[in-house]
UniProtKB/Swiss-Prot annotation:
Residues 1-19 form the signal peptide. The lineage of its organism: Eukaryota, Sar, Stramenopiles, Oomycota, Peronosporales. Induction: Highly expressed during infection. This is RxLR effector protein 62. Keywords: Glycoprotein, Secreted, Signal, Virulence. One of its GO terms (cellular component) is extracellular region. A motif (RxLR-dEER) lies at residues 49-60. Its main location: secreted. It comes from Hyaloperonospora arabidopsidis (strain Emoy2). Glycans are attached at residue 61. It comes from the Eukaryota. Secreted effector that suppresses callose deposition, a hallmark of pathogen-associated molecular pattern (PAMP)-triggered immunity (PTI) and renders host plants more susceptible to bacterial infection. Reduces host plant responsiveness to salicylic acid (SA) in haustoriated cells into which host-translocated effectors are delivered.
Length: 131
């Protein structure tokens, strides 16, 4: 009986777990053995590892998503520009680079402006640089 009380006190003070969880019975004291695993510390270590690894994984996922979104936007832009009637754009702006740039900025195409301008230059559409 004293051994059981000693084991119980030891397990509660050092957070060691008893492998047998039924009420202590002096007739079955040999069944009560200490488990070497410290559950409390193990849970804390696991939680700390999870907190360290999670932000790195999320940052990696966000950077992968940013690359994928950029690729999809560029692909969509190229499809739209391939289908657009470039000559209509040229006649509408009549080579006025400032109006073209202003319209692009107004409608939120700032990130696409450089690529579209390069495409217009490649297609031979020249804008006056009067900005």
């Amino acid at each position: 009986m004293r051994l059981d009380i000693l084991l119980f006190t030891l397990s509660s003070s050092t957070s060691l777990a008893l492998s047998y969880s039924l009420p202590m019975d002096p007739a079955h004291s040999s069944v009560h053995t200490l488990s070497a695993a410290d559950r409390h510390i193990g849970e804390r270590v696991t939680r700390q590892r999870h907190l360290r690894e999670e932000p790195a994984n999320e940052a990696r996922n966000y950077s992968d998503l940013a690359v994928e979104i950029k690729r999809l936007v560029e692909e969509l832009d190229s499809r739209v520009l391939e289908q657009a009637d470039i000559s209509l754009l040229d006649r509408h702006y009549a080579g006025d680079y400032k109006a073209f740039r202003s319209d692009l900025m107004t409608y939120g195409y700032q990130t696409r402006f450089a690529e579209q301008y390069k495409l217009f230059k490649k297609l031979g559409i020249d804008f006056k640089h009067n900005y």
